[in-house]
C-alpha cells in the first residue's frame, strides 16, 4: 500500500501531497510498469513488447526527487518492469538517483510549479487565457495518441475551441 506524505516547498509556498509506493527502514522506491502496444490486426490483435528504459524517465526523476525530500534519511530506488524485461535503478548504478542529481531535479520541479502558478495568476480564472498560456500538442489529437484515443469528438471540439 502506498504511504501518504506532505512536503512544504518554500520556493512556492505550498504543499506537495505524495503517495510513495514502497518505504522500508532504509530505502524508499517507486514501481513503474512499461506496457507494450496492443494493435488490432485483420486476424485479431497483435502485442508489441516494450523494453524497460536504460536510464530513468525524466518525470520519474522529478518524482523521486520530491520523495527524497519527504524521506531524507532513506536511499531511493526506482524499478521498471514489462512483460519480459525489468530494471532496478539505485544511486550506485544510476547518476540520476544520486543526491546532487535529485537536488537538481527537485529545483526543476519547483520551477515547473512556479511557472504554473504564474500562468494561473495571469489567467485570473479565464480558462481561455490559461489555454493560450499552455501550448497544446495538437499532433497527438491528429495521430489519435494514447491520451486522445476514444475521446468523444465533442470534447475534442470543446478543447480546440479554447485555442480559437
Description of each model-found segment:
Residues 9-11, 36-54, 96, 118-130:
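Intrinsically disordered, low-complexity coil segments
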Residues 1-49:
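Catalytic cores of nuclease domains that cleave nucleic-acid phosphodiester backbones
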Residues 29, 40-69:
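Classical nucleotidyltransferase
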Residues 56, 66-164:
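Metal-dependent nuclease catalytic regions and adjoining charged, substrate-binding loops involved
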Amino acid at each position: 500500500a502506498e504511504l501518504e506524505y506532505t512536503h512544504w516547498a518554500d520556493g512556492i509556498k505550498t504543499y506537495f501531497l505524495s503517495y510513495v509506493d514502497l518505504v522500508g527502514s532504509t530505502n524508499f522506491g517507486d514501481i513503474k510498469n512499461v506496457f507494450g502496444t496492443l494493435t488490432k490486426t485483420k486476424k485479431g490483435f497483435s502485442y508489441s513488447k516494450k523494453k524497460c528504459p536504460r536510464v530513468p524517465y525524466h518525470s520519474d526523476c522529478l518524482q523521486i526527487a520530491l520523495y527524497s525530500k519527504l524521506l531524507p534519511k532513506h536511499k531511493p530506488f526506482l524499478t521498471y518492469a514489462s512483460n519480459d524485461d525489468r530494471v532496478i535503478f539505485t544511486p550506485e548504478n544510476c547518476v540520476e538517483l544520486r543526491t546532487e542529481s535529485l537536488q537538481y531535479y527537485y529545483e526543476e520541479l519547483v520551477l515547473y510549479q512556479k511557472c504554473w502558478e504564474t500562468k494561473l495568476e495571469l489567467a485570473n480564472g479565464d480558462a481561455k487565457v490559461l489555454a493560450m498560456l499552455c501550448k497544446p500538442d495538437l499532433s497527438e489529437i491528429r495521430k489519435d495518441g494514447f491520451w486522445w484515443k476514444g475521446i468523444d469528438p465533442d470534447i475534442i471540439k470543446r478543447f480546440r475551441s479554447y485555442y480559437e
